[in-house]
Amino acid sequence: MASTLTSKPQRLALFENSASSFYGTPLAPSSIRVQPTKAGAKPSISMSGAPSPPYDLKAFTFDPIKESIVSREMTRRYMMDMITYADTDVVVVGAGSSGLVCYELSKNPSVQVAIIEQSVSPGGGAWLGGQLFSGMVVRKPAHLFLDELGIEYDEQDNYVVIKHAALFTSTIMSKLLARPNVKLFNAVAAEDLIVKGGRVGGVVTNWALVSMNHDTQSCMDPNVMEAKVVVSSCGHDGPFGATGVKSLRSIGMIDTVPGMKALDMNVAEDAIVRLTREIVPGMIVTGMEVAEIDGAPRMGPTFGAMMISGQKAAHLALKALGLPNALDGSYVGGIHPELILAAADSAEIADA
């Protein structure tokens, strides 16, 4: 049977008539040169690509493009993403420090993950530390997650400090968005939930700017994303904060959202991880939104609980999907399961 060592990837039918190079610009063919050798010596073969032309910055010119091509390339890809993720495995609402750490989900290539973020710039409050300062404090043992990401820090006895919070956020974001089974829909808000038979089955979406201007127009209906599991990581109260648990309260699936209590770092971070859970069938709550629903203290500018809460939420989602996870011991990988195994009684409320 004949076989080939290389094969050209098949193009999607959608791109058959496109003149763009979806699979990348082909490299210039290499030239192979056989050097003459003396008798008995092995031939010497050298390979070199076509030389790159020198840049003339006084007469720099880009390759030409038709304006409509730019529009079509953006539109086609975004529309294909909307079609692909209209019915997905997991929707993560909120791409802050806890939501981004749900990148644990993306390690399983069979899990399709859509991330919805109302802001143009994902990251939530994790671009800075407290009071607009740049350093990010992470209490041990959450520094083990930073080791996994390869993020450098200044180590102290009980905590570590990243020189700039943006280093953490940009690193995890780049790792997450590079995965083929993840799509970030930023500038998109989750206005409501899909609920069927007492189970959350997705989210109702709209452009964030539309959500902010419903009172100025007569009718701007939303769109939907169905999902097997919804992870709500919308943060503490605010214009788009704690929207997941607020929606549950408005439709009667939970009774109250008492809001977070006064700051106590030592109580707060442990409580956030412990109380991260599937709050109603089909919906997991993580990060500071946990404090809103359970009346836990706020933690202030420490970020370890955000990271470990996000890890725990990811493995709760994997468990809900019937996939290997650290919670039941079926997961095989580099995670530190001791960080996320803290169980939570669904009726437990954190004390300030």
Curated annotation (Swiss-Prot):
UniProt keyword list: Chloroplast, Iron, Metal-binding, NAD, Plastid, Thiamine biosynthesis, Transferase
Gene Ontology cellular component annotations, sorted alphabetically: chloroplast stroma; cytosol
Binding site for substrate: S98, E117, Q118, G125, A190, D221, H236, M288, R298, M299, G300
Miscellaneous comment as given in the Swiss-Prot or TrEMBL entry: This protein may be expected to contain an N-terminal transit peptide but none has been predicted.
Cystines in this chain: none
2,3-didehydroalanine (Cys) PTM positions: C219
InterPro entries listed in its UniProt record: FAD/NAD-bd_sf, Sti35, Thi4_fam
Name of the featured protein: Thiamine thiazole synthase, chloroplastic
EC nos: 2.4.2.60
Leading EC class: transferase
Keyword Glycoprotein part of the UniProt annotation: no
First and last residue of the signal peptide: none
GO MF annotations, alphabetized: cysteine-dependent adenosine diphosphate thiazole synthase activity; iron ion binding
Organism per entry: Alnus glutinosa
Pfam families: Thi4
